[in-house]
C-alpha cells in the first residue's frame, strides 16, 4: 500500500481535500476559452469573498504570495510616495526589505513580536510625517500567529487620507474582511492558504482607480500589476504561461469553501481546531507564545521545551514519523515552534497531532514540568 500523506500543520502549503487534488488531473490550454472562463470565475469569487463590489478587481499572478506583495508595492506606490510599515514580525520585515530593494521611501514603526500594531501609534506616526502616502500592513503576522487590528487601522488611514495596502496572506477566507467602504487600496493573498488550494498563485484585489492610474510605474515586467490587469481586460488571458492546474485546484477549493458556508464557517472550523490544539498542548505542558487576545486561529506559536534533551530537528522528525508535519519557529526573541490549524482538517486531526507530540516527548525523554 502507498504511504499515507502526512498531515501538514503548517500555514501553507496545506493538507488539501481529495476533490481539490483531483481537479489537477486534467490539462488545460492556456489560451482556450474554457480556461479563460475558469480564470474569470475564480477572480469574481475572490472579489466576492473580499466584499469588494464593482470598485475592486482581482489580478492573479503566477508564483507565491510574496510575488503578489512585491507586485502590489511596486505598482501601486508612486515613485514619490512614502510607505509606513508597522513591524511586529518577519513578514512585516519582508515588506520593508522589498521596499528597500525597489528604492521606495519608507519608514518602519516597530512593535514587539507579541504586540499587535496600535492604531493610535500609527495615527501618531502619520501625524508626525506628512510625507507618508501609504501604509503597508500585515493583517495576520504568521511568524507568531499575531492578529493586527485591520478595521481600526483602516479607519485611521481613511481619516488621514492615506492609502492602505494589506497583506492578508494568512487571514483571507478565514477572518471577516469587507473591502467596500474600507478605503483599502489593495488586499493580497494566495491560493495555498485559508482557501485551501495548492500553492502557485498569488492575487491582488485592488481598487480600480489607483490600479488604472499606475500604468508604467512598476520597475518589473513580470510583476507589473497594471500590465497584467490591462492585458487580462483586453484578452481574458494571462500575459505569461499561467499555473493552469493551480487555478483548477483553486476553483475546486472555492466550490468547497462556499459549500462549507463561506468565511463564517471556515473561520469557525479553524477556531475549533485552534481550541482543540491549545487545550491539548496545555495538557502536555506547552504554553502559547501569544496572549489569547492577540492570537489568531490560523497558526499557534508555542514555547519550546526548556529541557536540554529538546532539539527541534529530532522533535520534528519524531512527530513526522507519526504522520504530522510541524513548522519551525520564526521569532527573534524566543525559542519556539509553530503548529498550523488550517487546511482540510478538523478537531479530530488536531487531537491526533497533540497525541503525536506527546509521543515524541516520551520517545525523546523530554520533560515538560
UniProtKB/Swiss-Prot annotation:
Keywords: Aminotransferase, Pyridoxal phosphate, Pyruvate, Transferase
Pfam families: Aminotran_5
GO MF: 2-aminoethylphosphonate-pyruvate transaminase activity
Annotated EC: 2.6.1.37
Cofactor(s) it depends on: pyridoxal 5'-phosphate
Enzyme class, UniProt record, top EC level: transferase
Keyword Membrane belongs to the record: no
Domain of life: Bacteria
In-chain residues carrying the UniProt-annotated modification N6-(pyridoxal phosphate)lysine: 193
InterPro entries linked to this entry: Aminotrans_V_dom, NH2EtPonate_pyrv_transaminase, PyrdxlP-dep_Trfase, PyrdxlP-dep_Trfase_major, PyrdxlP-dep_Trfase_small, SP_NH2Trfase/AEP_transaminase
Reaction(s) the record says it catalyses: (2-aminoethyl)phosphonate + pyruvate = phosphonoacetaldehyde + L-alanine
Family label: Belongs to the class-V pyridoxal-phosphate-dependent aminotransferase family. PhnW subfamily.
Protein name: 2-aminoethylphosphonate--pyruvate transaminase
